[in-house]
């Protein structure tokens, strides 16, 4: 039996309004619990369009057929008009998710975090995280115990800033296994649960065809030597590719693969490490990546 952490990122208004209810229904039918990370502030994701001038981002958008994958409402959100606030407008959906799944913070403003947080000072970053946590806690009526940095944009500054909130764990980076990042003080910080597997948009049209993706991914899962964690997006697997996700769950069950919330992957003893800036094939720009203590 292979146990895989299932992380669901919710980046946009439509992903919350349309994708999350569909995913909740699918997961219920398959008796699966997951960790769902919500963006709760303004939906300004359309402002990423300026990145089309970067060849790597343009190629990603073309090979993944982004217009049909996400829809023009997502691709243009927050450009010609102010971005709609996601959280309180979809409070009932978020509360329903929290009844059955582990719920954490993805971002206050996903676009702002991904595009500008690397230039923020620590207090600005703390204030932004606090705003998102406060909003999510108001919605679900209970403390939030986990978070996942938007776009995996995390480095030592993010790790230090999140220590102020005493969360149970964060999932801010890519890597191989859960670990505790070393702080500037030399002490171990809040546990990190890295994503280990590629996302749909990172590999479609580059490493694998859409129709072959599920078999390709299951092969990666079964060969994973660490602690496998897979991320889906409400805007993708909850919308245009929900049928592919259902097929993945059915095939996974046949292969003895089970899915669980990320918190179930934690153990009392974790290795030490750091979150450093790195690159992942198929994704434009830098991401937080796990570095085991003592390695270079």
Curated annotation (Swiss-Prot):
SUPFAM superfamilies: Glycoside hydrolase/deacetylase. It comes from the Bacteria. Residues 2-260 form the NodB homology domain. Pathway: Glycolipid biosynthesis; 4-amino-4-deoxy-alpha-L-arabinose undecaprenyl phosphate biosynthesis; 4-amino-4-deoxy-alpha-L-arabinose undecaprenyl phosphate from UDP-4-deoxy-4-formamido-beta-L-arabinose and undecaprenyl phosphate: step 2/2; Bacterial outer membrane biogenesis; lipopolysaccharide biosynthesis. GO terms for biological process: 4-amino-4-deoxy-alpha-L-arabinopyranosyl undecaprenyl phosphate biosynthetic process; lipid A biosynthetic process; lipopolysaccharide biosynthetic process; response to antibiotic. It is an enzyme of class 3 (hydrolase). One of its GO terms (cellular component) is membrane. GO terms for molecular function: hydrolase activity, acting on carbon-nitrogen (but not peptide) bonds, in linear amides. Coiled coil: none annotated. Keywords: Antibiotic resistance, Hydrolase, Lipid A biosynthesis, Lipid biosynthesis, Lipid metabolism, Lipopolysaccharide biosynthesis. InterPro entries: ArnD (IPR023557), Glyco_hydro/deAcase_b/a-brl (IPR011330), NODB_dom (IPR002509), Polysacc_deacetylase_ArnD (IPR050248). It catalyses: 4-deoxy-4-formamido-alpha-L-arabinopyranosyl di-trans,octa-cis-undecaprenyl phosphate + H2O = 4-amino-4-deoxy-alpha-L-arabinopyranosyl di-trans,octa-cis-undecaprenyl phosphate + formate. It holds the Pfam family Polysacc_deac_1. Gene3D superfamilies: Glycoside hydrolase/deacetylase (3.20.20.370). Its EC number is 3.5.1.n3. Belongs to the polysaccharide deacetylase family. ArnD deformylase subfamily. PANTHER family: 4-DEOXY-4-FORMAMIDO-L-ARABINOSE-PHOSPHOUNDECAPRENOL DEFORMYLASE ARND-RELATED, GLYCOSYL TRANSFERASE-RELATED. Catalyzes the deformylation of 4-deoxy-4-formamido-L-arabinose-phosphoundecaprenol to 4-amino-4-deoxy-L-arabinose-phosphoundecaprenol. The modified arabinose is attached to lipid A and is required for resistance to polymyxin and cationic antimicrobial peptides. This is Probable 4-deoxy-4-formamido-L-arabinose-phosphoundecaprenol deformylase ArnD. It comes from Escherichia coli O139:H28 (strain E24377A / ETEC).
């Amino acid at each position: 039996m292979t146990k895989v952490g299932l992380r669901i990122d919710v980046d946009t208004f439509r992903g919350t309004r349309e994708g999350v209810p569909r995913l909740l229904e699918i997961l219920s039918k398959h008796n699966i619990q997951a960790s769902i990370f919500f963006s709760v502030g303004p939906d300004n994701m359309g402002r990423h369009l300026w990145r089309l001038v970067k060849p790597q981002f343009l190629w990603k958008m073309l090979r993944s057929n982004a217009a049909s994958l996400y829809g023009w409402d997502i691709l243009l959100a927050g450009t010609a008009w102010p971005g709609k606030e996601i959280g309180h407008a979809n409070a009932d959906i978020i509360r329903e998710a929290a009844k059955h799944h582990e719920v954490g913070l993805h971002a206050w403003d996903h676009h702002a975090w991904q595009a500008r947080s690397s230039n923020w000072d620590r207090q600005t970053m703390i204030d932004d995280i606090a705003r998102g946590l406060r909003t999510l806690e108001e919605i679900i009526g209970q403390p939030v115990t986990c978070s996942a940095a938007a776009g995996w944009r995390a480095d030592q500054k993010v790790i230090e800033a999140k220590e102020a909130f005493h969360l149970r764990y964060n999932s801010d980076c890519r890597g191989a296994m859960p670990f505790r990042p070393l702080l500037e003080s030399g002490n171990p910080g809040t546990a990190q649960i890295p994503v280990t597997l590629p996302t749909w948009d990172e590999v479609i049209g580059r490493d694998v065809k859409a129709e072959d993706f599920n078999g390709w991914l299951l092969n990666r899962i079964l060969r994973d030597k660490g602690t496998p964690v897979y991320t889906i997006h409400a805007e993708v697997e909850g919308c245009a590719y929900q049928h592919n996700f259902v097929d993945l769950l059915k095939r996974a069950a046949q292969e003895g693969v089970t899915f669980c919330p990320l918190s179930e992957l934690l153990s009392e003893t974790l290795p030490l490490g750091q979150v450093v800036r790195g690159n992942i094939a198929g994704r434009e720009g830098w991401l937080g990546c796990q570095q085991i203590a003592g390695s270079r």
